[in-house]
């Protein structure tokens, strides 16, 4: 079982749920207390390291989904 995080898939899911909640990247970034540039990198799967757990927790809370939903690889 591969436990690594697919940053591209994570970013796609965050973007999907953000749009479903009718939020812009700017609004989500502000609510999570991160820069818009970093939010954009997360959604594009361009983060060099994994997204930190506190940031991921904040994103999931704002979007109203579980961290598991964001990280789950739906193969």
Segments predicted by a language model, with ranges:
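Alpha-helical residues within the helix-turn-helix
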Residues: 19, 30, 61
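Residues within the helices of the helix-turn-helix
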Residues: 15, 26, 57
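Short coil turns linking two alpha-helices in DNA-binding domains
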Residues: 24, 35-37, 52, 66
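Recognition helix of helix-turn-helix/homeodomain-like DNA-binding domains
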Residues: 33-49
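Short, basic-rich loop-to-helix N-cap that marks the start of a DNA-contacting helix
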Residues: 46-61
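Short C-terminal boundary/hinge segments that cap the last helix of small helical domains
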Residues: 64-75
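A short, Lys/Arg-rich alpha-helix, primarily the initiator
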Residues: 1-20
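Conserved hydrophobic/aromatic packing and binding residues within compact polymer-binding modules
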Residues: 14, 28-29, 39-42, 70
């Amino acid at each position: 079982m591969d436990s690594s995080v697919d940053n591209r898939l994570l970013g796609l899911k965050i973007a999907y749920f953000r749009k479903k909640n009718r939020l812009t990247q700017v609004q989500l970034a502000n609510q999570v207390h991160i820069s818009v540039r970093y939010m954009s990198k997360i959604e594009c799967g361009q983060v060099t390291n994994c997204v930190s757990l506190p940031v991921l927790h904040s994103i999931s809370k704002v979007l109203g989904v579980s961290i598991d939903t964001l990280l789950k690889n739906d193969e």
